[in-house]
């Protein structure tokens, strides 16, 4: 199968999960595959080549009339930033491990595979969904939140967990995990023992947090 066609199909598969009600043309999908996933430069030139803008048309004008494409582009860019941050952090370590073969498309394919229909991911251990985690860390008008931490890495985003902490970041070794599970599980505890002895208490904790969120946002 043609490489670009495979990338377009991957983009389409992810967008159907993330934005099930949005409509994308074949040209939209090719643009996102080339610019957002394959990281081809010259955004305007790609749009012109695909007939998405013409004459004095601008990139900004295209996005103004195609908000679903703008949202999709921004979403894929956020995923790329997660990949790039992980890759760069490993490069700074004395003993770095491989991050998806230094290939964003491989990382994006894994992300897509781990994203369920509807686009809401869950922790692989305690099964809390990311909407709950985000709500717990969200600040209100008084700059208060249900869960707070001084560590920037402790946030409402699900983290990338290596099942084997000594292994690479790869499709068969990575899952999404909430910040609580990801930081509670160490290389001393197997996934099976963690689920058996620790996860029940963490589930109770998240149930408590959900009640606190409801009180905060009645």
List where the protein language model places each region:
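Secondary-structure boundary/linker elements at domain or insertion junctions
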Residues: 6, 15-17, 34-42, 48-98
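Glycine- and charge-rich intrinsically disordered segments
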Residues: 1-9, 13, 217
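Charged, low-complexity interaction regions
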Residues: 19-24
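Histidine-centered nuclease catalytic patch
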Residues: 105-108, 124-176, 185
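Short, charged surface segments at domain edges that flank catalytic/cofactor-binding sites
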Residues: 70-128, 133, 166
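A detector for short metal-coordination/catalytic motifs
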Residues: 168-218
């Amino acid at each position: 199968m043609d490489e670009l066609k495979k990338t377009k199909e991957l983009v389409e598969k992810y967008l159907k999960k993330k934005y099930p009600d949005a409509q994308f043309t074949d040209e939209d999908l090719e643009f996102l595959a080339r610019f957002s996933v394959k990281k081809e430069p010259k955004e305007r030139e790609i749009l012109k080549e695909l007939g998405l803008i013409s004459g004095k048309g601008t990139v900004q004008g295209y996005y103004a009339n195609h908000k679903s494409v703008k949202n999709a582009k921004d979403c894929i860019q956020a995923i790329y930033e997660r990949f790039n941050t992980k890759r760069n952090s490993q490069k700074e370590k004395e003993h770095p491990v491989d991050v998806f073969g230094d290939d964003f498309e491989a990382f994006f394919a894994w992300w897509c595979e781990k994203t369920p229909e509807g686009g809401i991911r869950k922790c692989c251990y305690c099964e809390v969904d990311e909407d709950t985690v985000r709500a717990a860390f969200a600040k209100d008008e008084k700059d208060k939140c249900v869960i707070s931490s001084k560590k920037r890495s402790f946030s409402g985003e699900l983290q990338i967990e290596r099942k084997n902490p000594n292994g690479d970041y790869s499709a068969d070794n990575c899952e999404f995990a909430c910040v609580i599970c990801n930081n509670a599980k160490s290389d001393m505890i197997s996934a099976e023992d963690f689920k058996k002895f620790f996860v029940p208490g963490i589930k109770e904790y998240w149930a408590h947090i959900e009640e606190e969120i409801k009180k905060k946002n009645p």
